[in-house]
Amino acid sequence: MAITHDELCLLACNFLQKNGFKVAFHDRFRAWTPYGEQADAIGFRNGASCLIEAKCSRSDLLADRKKPFRIEPEKGMGDWRFFISEPGIIEISDLPEGWGLLHVVKGRVKKVHGWPGNWEWVNRASKPFSANKQAECDYMFSALRRMDLRGHLKEVYDGVIINKPEPTLIEGEE
C-alpha cells in the first residue's frame, strides 16, 4: 500500500529530529513566507537548515519545478534540500542541482543521495544552497508567536531539561 503525503511528511520530520535537527516542523504547520513556500518538513540545527519535500507521484515532482522558489533557489528555504518518496517515484537523475534524495522502504527512511557527513552541515563551502534566511526567520517567528499567544513563550527562559527526574513519593502518599 502506498504511503500518503501526510505519512511522508511525518516520517521526514521525525527523520530530521533523529539526525540532529531538534527543531523541526512538518506540513501541518503553516506560516507566511515571502514567496509562499510551505515546507513539507523543515529542520533547524546550529548553523544549518534542511528542507524535505515529500512526493507521492512523478506529476507532483514535475509540478514542483514550476514554483518560484524552485526556479530561483535563493528564494527558497533550506541550506540543504531533499526529496523523500517511495522508490520508483524519484531517481537520482531526476534531481535538480544541489538536491538530495531519501527513500522510504518498509517504513524506514533510507539516505539515497546527498546526505552529508556531520561536519559538512555547517561548512559554508559544503552547503548546496544559500537559503532565504528571511523566509526561515518569518517561519520561526510564526511558530514562536503562536507559543506567545498561548502563553508559553516565557518557558524559553526555563533552560533546557536534559533528564527530568521522576517525582518521588513521600512515604504515606499515594
Can you say where each PLM-predicted feature lies in the sequence?
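Non-catalytic C-terminal interaction segments of nucleic acid-processing enzymes
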Residues: 3-19, 93-174
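Flexible, charged surface loops at secondary-structure boundaries
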Residues: 17-18, 44-46, 74-77
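Conserved beta-strand termini and adjacent loop/short-helix elements that scaffold enzyme active sites
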Residues: 26-27, 84-86, 104-106, 114
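Active-site beta-strand-loop-beta-strand hairpin of nuclease catalytic cores
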Residues: 37-51
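Catalytic cores of nucleic-acid endonucleases
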Residues: 49, 55-104
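A short, well-structured beta->alpha microelement
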Residues: 35-36, 58
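A short acidic/basic microdomain associated with nuclease active sites
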Residues: 17-34
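Anionic group-transfer/hydrolysis microenvironments
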Residues: 29, 42, 55
